[in-house]
Amino acid sequence: MSSPPTRPSKSGVVPGTATLILLGCGLLVLHPSPSRQATAQDGAPEFEQSVDLSRLRSYTLANNPDIKAAEQRWRAAQARPSQEGSLPDPMVNTGYHNESFGRLTQGSSDFSWIRLGAEQEVPFPGKLSLKETVAAREADREGAMYGAAILSVVTRLRVAYDEYALVHQSLEIVRRNQGLLEQLEQAAEAKYRVGEGLQQDVLRAQVELSVLLGRLTSLEQERQSAAAMLNAILNRPPAAPLGTPQAIEKVSFSHTADELESIARERSPNLRAAQLGVDRAESSLDLARRQYYPDFVLRADYYNKADLTPEWEVGAGIRIPLYFWRKQAFGVQEAAAGVSEARATKQSTSQDVLARIQSLHAQVTAAERLVDLYGGTVVPQAELSLHSASAGYQVGRVDFLTLLNSFTVLNEYQLRYSEELAAFDKAVAQLEEAAGLLPDDVAGRSRQ
């Protein structure tokens, strides 16, 4: 059996959570120029003839709403640290003091003046820096989640592309085999006409042709569904036209599960986000404990007495946490519970990621064996069986039922081989996501 056409390399992005965030800002073209944005919005026709994963990925990174939303959440979080670390806004006030109700006494009495004042609240040293740290940790966590969103969308795109390519590949197989079956029907009919065959052989071939037509109808419906799912990820109308995809090809994946676990601990944006959640919660606990300390208020006033000598006054106040047992104490309890929650979430996330890696690695291993089995043994043997049965039928040593059965077996095994290729590629994509890797960013993977 001839090898399938080669799909262009699934170009990836340099790994690591920090890199994901950086690429999200620039290299992944999440902020295209106006001309590029116009191309993205008006670019539906560019996929009408053919589609490949590399172009689809670029389009997705520029247009997918999940990525855009994650990016904006990150940018919003980046704007908070400066706000949290700034002093409260000062208060400016004014007032007029008069000595009596009968007349205005400013300028004629020391007890009459116009006052201008300013007041500034100053939190206890360390509070503002802790507030800024908490906000910065949250911004970092949102950045990690932004990287996770990129990974998730790219993986969903690849899985949806594999589904779309599988349906197209299946349609090609069934249509090709439909032509072959029509030839078998013609051969059976020719033998029947000269009295060397049976009418039931012709009828069996026609029944099998009807079955293939039904299969084509089902596959066409699946093609429309797969195209709609792919368009959804691309942020295009569900019925937007999509051309012929590249055929699914076999990839080699040599990483062990232990190696992938080590990679995940360093690069997984979900694990990074969980750790930053712990850091944020611990900083929040430090801030809650700092609330036991008083804040200060600085004040300055100027008294204008018109023709008399003006006066000024400065002062300071302390905001005492008098009801600490009802307020600050419970704030510390709340923050401590938040730390426990964040640590538990980190542990749960770690367990989920590592378990997912083990499970997906087992799926990849099993799927690769099936691909090798079908591609290297089952399908070639089925082809030989059909060729042998066809030759035997021509000379009368094999009946038509045996020939038709050989054809049916080959058709099913070719379809199954395509399904196993798609299942293998999807499992590899999901495993890369779990380990925090983008496509083609795995050193142990190479094209065959």
What are these regions (language model features)?
Residues S2-K10, A148-R265, Q363, A367, ...:
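Periplasmic alpha-helical coiled-coil/stalk elements that build and connect Gram-negative outer-membrane
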Residues S2-K10, V29-P45, R416-Q448:
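Acidic, low-complexity, intrinsically disordered peripheral segments
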Residues T17-H31:
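Bacterial N-terminal signal peptides
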Residues D42-Q49, N93-K131, G243-A257, D286, ...:
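Small/polar, glycine/serine/threonine/aspartate-rich low-complexity segments that form flexible
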Residues R57-L61, G197, D201-V202, Q206, ...:
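Amphipathic alpha-helical coiled-coil scaffold segments and their short linker/junction regions
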Residues S58-K68, R75-P90, T105-S108, L116-T133, ...:
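A glycine-/polar-enriched beta->alpha junction
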Residues T60, A118, Y164, L230, ...:
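Hydrophobic/aromatic residues within transmembrane alpha-helices of membrane transport systems
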Residues A69-P81, A149, V153-V174, Q183, ...:
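Amphipathic alpha-helical coiled-coil segments
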